[in-house]
Amino acid sequence: MSSRGHSTLPRTLMAPRMISEGDIGGIAQITSSLFLGRGSVASNRHLLQARGITCIVNATIEIPNFNWPQFEYVKVPLADMPHAPIGLYFDTVADKIHSVSRKHGATLVHCAAGVSRSATLCIAYLMKFHNVCLLEAYNWVKARRPVIRPNVGFWRQLIDYERQLFGKSTVKMVQTPYGIVPDVYEKESRHLMPYWGI
């Protein structure tokens, strides 16, 4: 494409049906072959099979894999801490999601709450394989799962990844009375708590 990182979302990305988080216990459909959810979703074999999920990316250190034989498991052993090196896994996880999709499977990426670690990995995947900038990828995932809030350390790594992919960044870290946050959080910063890594 002529302007990498600034294209509009392709029709294939916009096509998936919205799934209510409340109806199915904390899962959201990000693309036709990618789901994002909290850790409890990974224990619901019926739900996983009903959604056509064949691969589970477990982005936690605290939740064990269930190791059911019908699913492929990928472990990303990270704490939800700003210093955790999630960027080391961006390419590996994105490549796996893409590979599963090409085989007509679907991937669930989960962490404990489905808010920070798993959302960060989904955003990185969208940048790499759907050729969208960081801001657009974040807005897309947030529209599907409004509770997402990657911690500030993960934002820094996403910004670096966007620069690596596209040579520029569409999100900046800014100083607020509550600490340094990504500019997409600036309007909400008075509501942020230390839990979010500020």
Swiss-Prot record:
It catalyses: O-phospho-L-tyrosyl-[protein] + H2O = L-tyrosyl-[protein] + phosphate; O-phospho-L-seryl-[protein] + H2O = L-seryl-[protein] + phosphate; O-phospho-L-threonyl-[protein] + H2O = L-threonyl-[protein] + phosphate. The active site is at residue 111. Keywords: Hydrolase, Protein phosphatase. GO terms for molecular function: MAP kinase tyrosine/serine/threonine phosphatase activity; protein serine/threonine phosphatase activity; protein tyrosine phosphatase activity; RNA binding. Residues 26-167 form the Tyrosine-protein phosphatase domain. Involved in the inactivation of MAP kinases. Dephosphorylates ERK, JNK and p38 MAP-kinases. Plays a negative role in TCR signaling by dephosphorylating MAP3K7 adapter TAB1 leading to its inactivation. This is Dual specificity protein phosphatase 14. Belongs to the protein-tyrosine phosphatase family. Non-receptor class dual specificity subfamily. The keyword Hydrolase applies. The lineage of its organism: Eukaryota, Metazoa, Chordata, Craniata, Vertebrata. Gene3D superfamilies: Protein tyrosine phosphatase superfamily. Interacts with CD28. The keyword Hydrolase applies.
